[in-house]
Amino acid sequence: MSNILRKVIENDKGELRKLEKIAKKVESYADYMESLSDKDLQAKTPEFKQRYQNGETLEQLLPEAFAVVREAARRVLGLYPYRVQIMGGIVLHNGDVPEMRTGEGKTLTATMPVYLNALAGEGVHVITVNEYLSTRDATEMGEVYSWLGLSVGINLAAKSPAEKREAYLCDITYSTNSEVGFDYLRDNMVVRQEDMVQRPLNFALVDEVDSVLIDEARTPLIVSGAVSSETNQLYIRADMFVKTLDSVDYIIDVPTKTIGLSDSGIDKAESYFNLSNLYDIENVALTHFVDNALRANYIMLLDIDYVVSEEGEILIVDQFTGRTMEGRRFSDGLHQAIEAKEGVRIQEESKTSASITYQNMFRMYKKLAGMTGTAKTEEEEFREVYNMRIIPIPTNRPIARIDHTDLLYATLNSKFKAVVADVKARYEKGQPVLVGTVAVETSDLISKKLVEAGIPHEVLNAKNHFKEAQIIMNAGQRGAVTIATNMAGRGTDIKLGEGVRELGGLCVIGTERHESRRIDNQLRGRSGRQGDPGESQFYLSLEDELMRRFGTDRIKAFLDRMNNDDEDIVIKSRMLSRQVESAQKRVEGNNYDTRKQVLQYDDVMREQREIIYANRRDVITANRDLGPEIKAMIKRTIDRAVDAHSRTNRKDAIDAIVTFARTSIVPEETIGAKELRGLKDDQIKDKLYQRALEIYDKQLSKLRDQDAILEFQKVLILMIVDNKWTEHIDALDQLRNAVGLRGYAQNNPVVEYQSEGFKMFQDMIGAIEFDVTRTMMKAQIHEQERERATQYATTTAAQNIQSQAIGDDFDSSADFSRVERNDACPCHSGKKFKNCHGRKAF
């Protein structure tokens, strides 16, 4: 083990020597750059661009380009990057992660690689975790880029597609991780190229990279549409039922946070819902509601997993940052179950139209880099998943913070008493204190205890995150006491007020260990920035969540031996301290394994998504006739239909092929069994294909010109692809839930998911081609002289696709072109148009 550790340390030292050598070369240009006038320094940007066009690589330009940015930052911002910041910038340019401590100037470090990579003209995305940081960094650092002649854009959720397109066309674009992901998904749902906003993904530099690529790796970005549902009463009934249960009626598995009914609970459910067998196949939907109601009531905790806003909305709390996750909902009906539990309005369920995880989103960039102060503990995952190395960068000044040994107490009560006493003592001498908590519930509890002790303080958690910047700004002032969840102002420095250094600097107090050592290190890193004095102290108890869920029998035995009199005594035990770290490592390992498994499943979706999106993009950007592609689909559809009946009785086969041809290819009266008898399969295929080509040409002749034809072809393909892809995503989700049980049959669930997912994808492609064929052959196309051909083509395709989706039992001569939403549908169904063939449009 010591040999491995020694090798790792030597590798890090060797890497730092290489970086220092390049950094010195950058520094060698300092005097020359300082001697240049503003105009001459600004002229370096077009010079570099020209040199790049002439064949010089970005690596060859690096020393000069970095030196230009250093000098520009000095003139514009009054800041001059240190050598360690240059080294960090080189690591970023190489597509790796420099681990730089809090307060070491990561934002300024990023300016050098961002400028260098922007010279290529393909766009650089600077990714932050929230819009406040995006706006702040784009405003401050944007001054340097603009001064050097580069354009800077900010991509915010509230911007219109036109404004977003403008932001993405800039040399440098600041955005949040979620907005970049959603823009990518939305771009792959549009019908016209001019509605797309992003360029091809080139270089992303991710701030707080561990938060985005590790903590949120499993978080899927989902674009979904509402599904009409009358199931709200079922959510309420299921909720009313589970609230009648006693603790013996359900079983909770604490480590996995899963729950199920016990035998007595099943008996109660059958009695409550008047059923003979709860788990009969016809009750599958009901058991889904009951399972979600159980989770909502006995697993999901108010103020820990979610909060209720003043507007009565359920907001998810991010377990890593403590922030509420606006716009996000628990999936699979759990969110609706929580809404029923809390008695707020139940919102409709939704159907996923497109989704992607951050893991696969950011792996699509040509080059990916990131910055953080805490990543070394996740080095293996960065390397395995993202092919990124973690390079620890030395601090500019030695760290003066004192990290005290953890103080361990027997109970939560004794721990909190000690925390309050410590805070009070420091407050009375004027030393600022930041108290870090894992949950909103804990921050509220400590706040209440501090009020009782007469200590004025500020609370920063998911309930008042809008005051974050102001609270963090004052957290380093004399006598300030701040309670914060893990959000603790990542990306915002806590600057010490006058006279605070002499008092020992900011003291960070952790009230329990997080599941991840990295999050603990982030909390510690709030103190002792840039060589400032500071302290950190963690208070733990044997009743903490981490110890309760992952502690060993030895800890439980230790607890049993404790007397009530011993409650307030600090426990000094190396064994228990090791158990804490061991529990954290175990959780980190479990989380990594889970993320790896998620990636294995998501890679199936990724491969399929890339095929669909690439073909979709090809259709959208096409300036050519798409006839050859559509004809190929028609040919394959006919071949599949004929081949499907080749092994059946010949008479039955001919009858089935005739039925297919009549419903999907030709007018009914124009083909019969007599015409196909005596022909071989290949001859039947050729005959049907020739008839289809005649109808295809006849259909397109109804459109005015080539532009209208191309628009019709595009919308025809895109609407059907989108419809089928949405259904396929839903089917893959269901498959994923189903294959999990196959592990009990000694089958590998991932392998099963891969093989069945591939077969489902092939089936979906066949279904797309069948619908394109049927719609192309059977659509009622009318020329609209007074309307733009493109608008007409879009409407016609949408209506005909919806017609095919609803069924074939309608009046095929009906004209839908001038029907208002509340008119009777021309298909004579008796329904209003908006509820029949106009349903897709409205």
Swiss-Prot record:
<keyword id="KW-0547">Nucleotide-binding</keyword>
<dbReference type="InterPro" id="IPR011115">
    <property type="entry name" value="SecA_DEAD"/>
</dbReference>
<keyword id="KW-1003">Cell membrane</keyword>
<feature type="binding site">
    <location>
        <position position="836"/>
    </location>
    <ligand>
        <name>Zn(2+)</name>
    </ligand>
</feature>
<keyword id="KW-0067">ATP-binding</keyword>
<dbReference type="GO" id="GO:0008564">
    <property type="term" value="F:protein-exporting ATPase activity"/>
</dbReference>
<dbReference type="GO" id="GO:0065002">
    <property type="term" value="P:intracellular protein transmembrane transport"/>
</dbReference>
<comment type="subunit">
    <text>Monomer and homodimer. Part of the essential Sec protein translocation apparatus which comprises SecA, SecYEG and auxiliary proteins SecDF. Other proteins may also be involved.</text>
</comment>
<protein>
    <recommendedName>
        <fullName>Protein translocase subunit SecA</fullName>
        <ecNumber>7.4.2.8</ecNumber>
    </recommendedName>
</protein>
<dbReference type="InterPro" id="IPR011116">
    <property type="entry name" value="SecA_Wing/Scaffold"/>
</dbReference>
<dbReference type="GO" id="GO:0046872">
    <property type="term" value="F:metal ion binding"/>
</dbReference>
<keyword id="KW-0813">Transport</keyword>
<dbReference type="InterPro" id="IPR027417">
    <property type="entry name" value="P-loop_NTPase"/>
</dbReference>
<dbReference type="GO" id="GO:0005524">
    <property type="term" value="F:ATP binding"/>
</dbReference>
<dbReference type="InterPro" id="IPR014018">
    <property type="entry name" value="SecA_motor_DEAD"/>
</dbReference>
<dbReference type="InterPro" id="IPR014001">
    <property type="entry name" value="Helicase_ATP-bd"/>
</dbReference>
<keyword id="KW-0479">Metal-binding</keyword>
<feature type="binding site">
    <location>
        <position position="85"/>
    </location>
    <ligand>
        <name>ATP</name>
    </ligand>
</feature>
<dbReference type="GO" id="GO:0006605">
    <property type="term" value="P:protein targeting"/>
</dbReference>
<feature type="binding site">
    <location>
        <position position="837"/>
    </location>
    <ligand>
        <name>Zn(2+)</name>
    </ligand>
</feature>
<dbReference type="InterPro" id="IPR004027">
    <property type="entry name" value="SEC_C_motif"/>
</dbReference>
<dbReference type="Pfam" id="PF07517">
    <property type="entry name" value="SecA_DEAD"/>
</dbReference>
<feature type="binding site">
    <location>
        <position position="827"/>
    </location>
    <ligand>
        <name>Zn(2+)</name>
    </ligand>
</feature>
<keyword id="KW-1278">Translocase</keyword>
<dbReference type="Pfam" id="PF01043">
    <property type="entry name" value="SecA_PP_bind"/>
</dbReference>
<dbReference type="InterPro" id="IPR011130">
    <property type="entry name" value="SecA_preprotein_X-link_dom"/>
</dbReference>
<dbReference type="GO" id="GO:0005829">
    <property type="term" value="C:cytosol"/>
</dbReference>
<comment type="function">
    <text>Part of the Sec protein translocase complex. Interacts with the SecYEG preprotein conducting channel. Has a central role in coupling the hydrolysis of ATP to the transfer of proteins into and across the cell membrane, serving as an ATP-driven molecular motor driving the stepwise translocation of polypeptide chains across the membrane.</text>
</comment>
<dbReference type="GO" id="GO:0043952">
    <property type="term" value="P:protein transport by the Sec complex"/>
</dbReference>
<dbReference type="GO" id="GO:0005886">
    <property type="term" value="C:plasma membrane"/>
</dbReference>
<keyword id="KW-0862">Zinc</keyword>
<keyword id="KW-0472">Membrane</keyword>
<dbReference type="InterPro" id="IPR020937">
    <property type="entry name" value="SecA_CS"/>
</dbReference>
<dbReference type="InterPro" id="IPR001650">
    <property type="entry name" value="Helicase_C-like"/>
</dbReference>
<dbReference type="GO" id="GO:0017038">
    <property type="term" value="P:protein import"/>
</dbReference>
<keyword id="KW-0811">Translocation</keyword>
<dbReference type="InterPro" id="IPR044722">
    <property type="entry name" value="SecA_SF2_C"/>
</dbReference>
<dbReference type="InterPro" id="IPR036266">
    <property type="entry name" value="SecA_Wing/Scaffold_sf"/>
</dbReference>
<feature type="binding site">
    <location>
        <position position="493"/>
    </location>
    <ligand>
        <name>ATP</name>
    </ligand>
</feature>
<dbReference type="GO" id="GO:0031522">
    <property type="term" value="C:cell envelope Sec protein transport complex"/>
</dbReference>
<dbReference type="Pfam" id="PF07516">
    <property type="entry name" value="SecA_SW"/>
</dbReference>
<feature type="binding site">
    <location>
        <begin position="103"/>
        <end position="107"/>
    </location>
    <ligand>
        <name>ATP</name>
    </ligand>
</feature>
